[in-house]
């Protein structure tokens, strides 16, 4: 099944957090917090301003995004746990700065 979000909504798949700390301590499942990073799976066309003009979304499919702990609505689509949230719930897009520096 394919899901197409409406308006300014995005569908995000959480990216699991590390299971070990920097010091090598393994974090049990009960102590883990929900990850606040995810990969964008689908985006809506965007919202509309007061005059009805379409305002496109700045986020693209495949972007790695950072969002708040309580952002979005949890849904299950085709057996996958996903989040549907508004574009305004996304704090920013993560980029791989280190790989760009190595390429230069």
UniProtKB/Swiss-Prot annotation:
Any idea which GO molecular function terms this record carries?
A: ATP binding; metal ion binding; protein folding chaperone; protein-folding chaperone binding; unfolded protein binding
Q: Which GO terms describe its cellular component?
A: cytoplasm
Induction data: By NifA.
What keywords were assigned to this record?
A: Chaperone, Cytoplasm
Annotated localization? Cytoplasm
Q: Which InterPro entries match?
A: Chaperonin_GroES, Chaperonin_GroES_sf, Chaprnonin_Cpn10_CS, GroES-like_sf
| PROSITE patterns attached to this UniProt entry | CHAPERONINS_CPN10 (PS00681)
Annotated GO biological process? chaperone cofactor-dependent protein refolding
What family is it from?
A: Belongs to the GroES chaperonin family.
Summarize the subunit comment: Heptamer of 7 subunits arranged in a ring. Interacts with the chaperonin GroEL.
Annotated NCBIfam families: PRK00364.1-2, PRK00364.1-5, PRK00364.2-2, PRK00364.2-4
Know the name of this protein? Answer: Co-chaperonin GroES 3
Q: Say which species the protein is native to.
A: Bradyrhizobium diazoefficiens (strain JCM 10833 / BCRC 13528 / IAM 13628 / NBRC 14792 / USDA 110)
Annotated gene: groES3
């Amino acid at each position: 099944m394919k899901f197409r979000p409406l308006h300014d909504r995005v569908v995000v798949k959480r990216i699991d957090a590390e299971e070990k700390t920097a010091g090598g301590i393994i974090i049990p499942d009960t102590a883990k917090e929900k990850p606040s990073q995810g990969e964008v799976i689908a985006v809506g066309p965007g919202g509309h301003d007061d005059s009805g003009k379409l305002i496109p979304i700045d986020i693209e499919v495949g972007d790695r995004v950072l969002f708040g702990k309580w952002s979005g609505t949890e849904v299950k689509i085709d057996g996958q746990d996903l989040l549907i949230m508004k574009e305004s719930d996304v704090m920013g897009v993560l980029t791989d700065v280190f790989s760009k520096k190595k390429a230069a």
